[in-house]
């Protein structure tokens, strides 16, 4: 077997022997019937149960998956895709370029690891991709006798629980992480949805592990909030001037009040001290200024239905379930004049960094991981392997154009679009904000250019995948914020799937009324063009329009069915069969046109990518460039920049900016090696800063994570225990030991009130002087009193209802465990803020945080025991 000519990395050559084994099995597998191939799954499962060695099954499992893929989808894994699968199975990240078939690659290790019957999770970034991949790739798994699950945002509890039981489950990062937190707040095992973790494949791993790593996932509960202070602070902020009353640190998104600013605010508010702990104004003021000076509408958030919705700066998508913390969200609400929602306190939280490390086996795939490989390896212990492309890369990355100011840059982009549009070459323009995307859209309108707009606005988000999929159509111009539509392939000449569904939807809705039937041939000439099938198409359409069940469908019902048609393997209703036939006929026709359009666009140079600003990370820039040149297609990319871009403004050296100002003419761009190197250096500085921030978060959260794991482990044991008698007795005995230790402390007053308060009764034997009692005798006596009190309480509950005491014990332990953990999280958050300042005193903040967090955790355990035993002994039945 010859080696793949594109494999240059000697590290990948280690997989060649396995590739040879997989290919050698192909001929024999092709001779098997479908049933015989399916039975291979049960044979491999049996072998695994006997040998417990998954590595021994790798070659055969991969070969079986490839054959099943070819029989169900007509897709045969390339050798480089086999390498990608082997890399994933070895617990690494596969970097595969756009269009190289990452979704198909994941089926190889997923099938192999599903043979253990321990479950496989394939994690994607949104519900659409999870559903799409489960529908398409699920055909392979079902063919091989495996069941697949799908978790969606609006899924009910029982359905969610059932889908997690599948051998392979498709789910979003958001859903699986929040399900984990909710499971660890459950009051009984029947409320738990997740099985034990086994193997996880993360798609778009850089988006989840890096872009979203700094945002912890939080389940919160509302707390009383002083709404009026946010409103007043927002009004005060309007009277303050930048660089006079406050300074803006744009790099770190921070605000620093000047002495003049502090005095001015105290004068306006008529208070003596903004920092007064009894009536603090400073947090409200700082949040209000941040909301005004650092957070902008249609850039960092949008206003929708009288709510502030955050816009993800990396993807351009809205995040309706996220809120800024520390009062910032309320400050933005006050600024925009929308209803201010209550502050919240954390009931449970985890970062993606620590959540995904819970999986015993973890891997990921993306098109852009190499630039962040150090972070992947240091934090997640995930090496990155760059997988060669199946075909040579023909994309041309042209040098950046840099202009003097933003106006000149945007004008140049519009002119470039006008020039390219004349050739009919498709254009995809990536912008960094909603505001910029809409401004460019208005500019293109002035140039009389038609375009499709995709940004975080709700009316655009609904059509995200469709808009991105059609970005490769002849003559199309698509404006998209950052990486919106990620995961959707842009096919040169257009994507027939979306196009055909839209066409059929329009046909069905238009002709549902019988009065239109006489005009069928003239209004819909496309059907006549379908040569020998056109008459049959019209005949089926005519019968469909006379089907009462179809006519009862609303327009929304038709659209819903068309979107879900892939999930219906064998339609059982007549109108469904008819619609599926019409869709197939249209697809055949459109595929012929698409083949022609594909060749035309390739001859024009493929998709032309225009970047409107360098992002803070080279990885994000590469993601935009990677939208063109898929699977050996031609493509071109160029970035248009200005000296007013945030990267230049915040991280470019003053020497560079002065040089550029002198070199640049008003409306002409500049290309230079110095410029490129300077931009790369600026991006590297930002990447290092952002990495330090994520590493800082990880180091601190890792300490909390160890405590979280202990609490969740103990909590699960509580749920699984049939009886908690031993736990209650152990807690009670430890409480007594704690009290005796206190009583023996010379500084502690010698009184029996603490003991009597615990037992809620007067203990006769303690009337004598406590100093005269021996510790052992006192402990023995109190133990006996506690055991007696416990048995009395058990009897009291059992008389009322058999088994009631067991339920009560579980409830009270879980209640205090959860309350104490919630309070612990608040204290940890305050501690993290406080220790940061200690570096100024030449102390190590991380070391001190670790030490004090440990003490807080120990105190939490003591508090749980004392409160629990006290309330248990004081409890009574109403």
Curated annotation (Swiss-Prot):
Subcellular location: Plastid, Chloroplast stroma; Plastid, Chloroplast thylakoid membrane
GO cellular component labels: chloroplast stroma; chloroplast thylakoid membrane
Gene3D superfamilies, per the entry: Helical scaffold and wing domains of SecA, P-loop containing nucleotide triphosphate hydrolases, SecA, preprotein cross-linking domain
Pfam families: P-loop_SecA, SecA_DEAD, SecA_PP_bind, SecA_SW
Keyword Amino-acid biosynthesis: no
Membrane topology term: Peripheral membrane protein
UniProt binding sites for ATP: 81, 99-103, 489
Catalytic activity reported: ATP + H2O + cellular proteinSide 1 = ADP + phosphate + cellular proteinSide 2
This enzyme's EC code(s): 7.4.2.8
Gene Ontology terms for molecular function: ATP binding; protein-exporting ATPase activity
A GO biological-process term: protein import
Presence of the UniProt keyword Signal in the record: no
SMART domains: SecA_DEAD, SecA_PP_bind
UniProt entry keywords in alphabetical sequence: ATP-binding, Chloroplast, Membrane, Nucleotide-binding, Plastid, Protein transport, Thylakoid, Translocase, Translocation, Transport
InterPro entries xref list: Helicase_ATP-bd, P-loop_NTPase, SecA, SecA_CS, SecA_DEAD, SecA_motor_DEAD, SecA_preprotein_X-link_dom, SecA_SF2_C
Similarity comment: family membership: Belongs to the SecA family.
Function: Has a central role in coupling the hydrolysis of ATP to the transfer of proteins across the thylakoid membrane.
Protein name, per record: Protein translocase subunit SecA
């Amino acid at each position: 077997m010859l080696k793949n000519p594109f494999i240059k990395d000697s590290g990948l050559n280690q997989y060649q022997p396995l590739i040879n084994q997989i290919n050698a099995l192909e001929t024999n597998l092709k001779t098997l019937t479908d049933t015989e191939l399916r039975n291979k799954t049960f044979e491999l499962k049996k072998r695994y149960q006997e040998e417990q060695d998954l590595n021994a099954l790798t070659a055969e499992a991969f070969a079986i998956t490839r054959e099943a893929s070819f029989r169900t989808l007509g897709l045969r894994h390339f050798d480089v895709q086999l390498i990608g699968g082997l890399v994933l199975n070895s617990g690494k990240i596969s970097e595969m370029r756009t269009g190289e078939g990452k979704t198909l690659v994941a089926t190889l290790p997923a099938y192999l690891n599903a043979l253990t019957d321990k479950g496989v999770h394939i994690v994607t970034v949104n519900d659409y991709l999870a559903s799409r991949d489960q529908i398409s790739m699920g055909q392979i798994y079902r063919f091989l006798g495996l069941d697949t699950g799908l978790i969606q945002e609006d899924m009910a509890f029982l359905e969610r629980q059932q889908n997690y039981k599948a051998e392979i489950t498709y789910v979003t990062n958001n859903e699986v992480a929040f399900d984990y937190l909710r499971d660890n707040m459950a009051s009984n095992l029947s409320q738990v949805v997740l099985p034990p973790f086994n193997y996880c494949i993360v798609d778009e791993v850089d988006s989840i592990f890096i872009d979203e790593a700094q945002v912890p996932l939080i389940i919160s509960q509302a707390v009383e909030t002083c709404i009026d202070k946010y409103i007043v602070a927002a009004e005060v902020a309007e009277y303050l001037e930048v660089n006079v009353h406050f300074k803006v640190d744009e790099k770190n998104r921070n605000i620093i009040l000047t002495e003049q600013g502090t005095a001015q605010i105290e004068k306006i508010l008529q208070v003596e001290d903004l920092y007064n702990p009894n009536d603090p104004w400073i947090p409200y003021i700082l949040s209000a200024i941040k909301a005004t000076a650092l957070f902008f509408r249609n850039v960092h958030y949008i206003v929708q239905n009288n709510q502030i919705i955050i816009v993800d700066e990396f993807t351009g998508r809205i995040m309706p379930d996220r809120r800024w913390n520390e009062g910032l969200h309320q400050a933005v609400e006050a600024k925009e004049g929308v209803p201010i929602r209550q502050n919240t306190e954390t009931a449970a939280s985890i970062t993606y960094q620590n959540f995904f490390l819970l999986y015993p086996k973890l891997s990921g795939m993306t098109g852009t991981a190499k630039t962040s490989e150090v972070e992947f390896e240091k934090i997640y212990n995930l090496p990155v392997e760059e997988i060669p492309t199946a075909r040579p890369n023909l994309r041309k990355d042209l040098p950046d154009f840099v202009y003097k100011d933003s106006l000149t840059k945007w004008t140049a982009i519009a002119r470039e679009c006008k020039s390219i549009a004349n050739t009919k070459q498709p254009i995809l323009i990536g912008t960094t904000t909603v505001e910029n995307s809409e401004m460019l859209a208005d500019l293109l309108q002035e140039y009389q250019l038609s375009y499709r707009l995709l940004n975080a606005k709700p009316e655009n988000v609904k059509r995200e995948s469709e808009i991105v999929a059609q970005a490769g159509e002849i003559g199309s111009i698509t404006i998209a914020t950052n990486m919106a539509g990620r995961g959707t392939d842009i096919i040169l000449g257009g994507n027939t799937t979306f196009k055909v569904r839209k066409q059929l939807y329009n046909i069905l809705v238009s002709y549902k009324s019988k009065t239109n039937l006489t005009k069928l041939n003239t209004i819909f000439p496309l059907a006549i063009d379908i040569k020998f099938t056109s008459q049959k198409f019209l005949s089926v359409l005519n019968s469909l329009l006379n089907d009462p069940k179809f006519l009862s469908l609303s327009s929304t019902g038709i659209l819903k069915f068309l979107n879900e048609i892939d999930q219906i393997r064998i339609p059982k209703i007549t109108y469904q069969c008819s619609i599926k036939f019409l869709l197939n006929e249209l697809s055949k026709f459109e595929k012929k046109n698409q083949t022609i359009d594909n060749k035309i666009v390739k001859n024009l140079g493929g998709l032309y990518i225009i970047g409107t600003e360098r992002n803070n990370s080279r990885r994000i820039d590469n993601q935009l460039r990677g939208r063109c040149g898929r699977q050996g297609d031609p493509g071109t990319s160029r970035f248009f920049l200005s000296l007013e871009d945030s990267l230049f403004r915040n991280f470019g050296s003053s020497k560079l900016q002065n040089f550029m100002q002198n070199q640049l003419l008003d409306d002409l761009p500049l290309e230079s090696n110095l410029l490129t190197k300077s931009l790369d250096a600026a991006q590297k500085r930002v990447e290092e800063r952002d990495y330090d921030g994520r590493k800082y978060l990880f180091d601190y959260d890792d300490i909390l994570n160890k405590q979280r794991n202990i609490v969740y482990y103990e909590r699960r044991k509580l749920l699984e225990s049939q009886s908690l008698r031993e736990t209650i007795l152990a807690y009670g005995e430890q409480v007594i030991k704690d009290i005796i230790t206190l009583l023996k402390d010379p500084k502690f007053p010698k009184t029996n009130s603490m003991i009597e308060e615990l037992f809620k009764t007067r203990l006769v034997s303690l009337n004598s002087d406590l100093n005269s009692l021996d510790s052992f005798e006192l402990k023995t006596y109190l133990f006996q009193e506690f055991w007696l009190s416990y048995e009395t309480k058990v009897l009291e509950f059992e008389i009322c209802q058999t088994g009631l005491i067991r339920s009560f014990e579980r409830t009270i332990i879980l209640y205090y465990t959860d309350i104490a953990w919630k309070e612990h999280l608040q204290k940890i958050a305050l501690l993290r803020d406080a220790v940061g300042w200690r570096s100024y005193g030449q102390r190590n903040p991380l070391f001190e945080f670790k030490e004090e967090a440990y003490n807080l955790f120990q105190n939490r355990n003591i508090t749980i025991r004392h409160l629990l035993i006290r309330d248990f002994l004081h409890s009574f039945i109403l």
